[in-house]
Every structure is written in C-alpha cells, then in structure tokens.
Amino acid sequence: MFTCGWVGERYCPGTLNAGRGLRGTLSNVFKILFYTPEIPGNTGNAIRLAAITGAELHLVKPLGFNFDDAHLRRAGLDYHDLAVVTVHETLDDAWQALTPERVFAFTTTASTSYADIEYRPGDVFMFGPESVGLPAEVQQDSHVTERVKIPMKPGRRSLNLANSASIAIFEAWRQNGFEGGAI
C-alpha cells in the first residue's frame, strides 16, 4: 500500500496527505474504492470528488494507467494535493488498511437501490472496472454489506464510473447534513 501525492510535477508515493480539503478523521470520512480501474480520466475525476467532499479514494491494483498520465492529471485539475489517494496491491490489502464496518458494492445486477440505504461516516463505496464492473467473487466478498445499484432506464448498460461514485458520495454526504461542507 502507498498513499499518493504530487511532488513537484510528478505524482508519486508519499506520506498520508491530509490535504487542505474537507477532512475528518480516518474513521469518519466516506471512502471510495475503485477495484482495478482502467480509465485515467475517471480516476482523475474521483480524485477531484474526494478533494471536494473530504472522502478518501482507494485504488486496488492492477491499474489501467500510471500516475503520470496526462488524462488523470487533467481530470483532477489542481485538486490532487487536496485529496487522500491510497493504492493497494490487492483487495485483501485494502481491507486490512480500511478495516471497514460497512461496504456497499455498486453493481447493475443488484436489486437494492443506493437511495434505500442510510449511510454512515466510514462507509466504503466499492466500484468495479469500467469495462466489466465488479466481478462476482468481489461482490460476494465477506466484507461486502450489501450490493446496491443506481437506477437507470431499461436497456442501458451502466453509468460512467466517476459519475456513479459522485452520485453515491453526494447522497451519503447529503444524508449526513453535508458535514464539514460550505452550503
């Protein structure tokens, strides 16, 4: 596991970056977990989302890009140093670091709507790779509290990964009174 941050012009492992964003303690912030993300722009957008909401972003390898990717940087704009981004070698490593109480696996095959959940600080929101979503074995992981979906029109495949994470995090944050935010 390593935590990332910008050092000069290069994104690289560093110490835990509490940033200047809306941060709580490690146990009371929402956590976004991207399992093997493939598209750098989506992760860049999620970095920006984490900075804006005070959430943490956790990435599980293998990643479909490197942190020098221009698309990742461009999507994150100047928010990279305001976010906590941690890269984990494996999903087991992520669980060990996160010690999650509740994990919500977002998948189009779930029957429960994300809007039917009462979210609590510390919850983990897990999303799969853009091309295939969360594999069945990851959805069935013992850490997963519930599988949830974002409703869509019939016949549509899925939402964009970063958009899905935004919907989830903002709903959880809204339910918790936008704690720490400026309204």
Regions found by a protein language model. Give the residues of each.
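Post-transcriptional modification and biogenesis factors for structured RNAs
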Residues: M1-I183
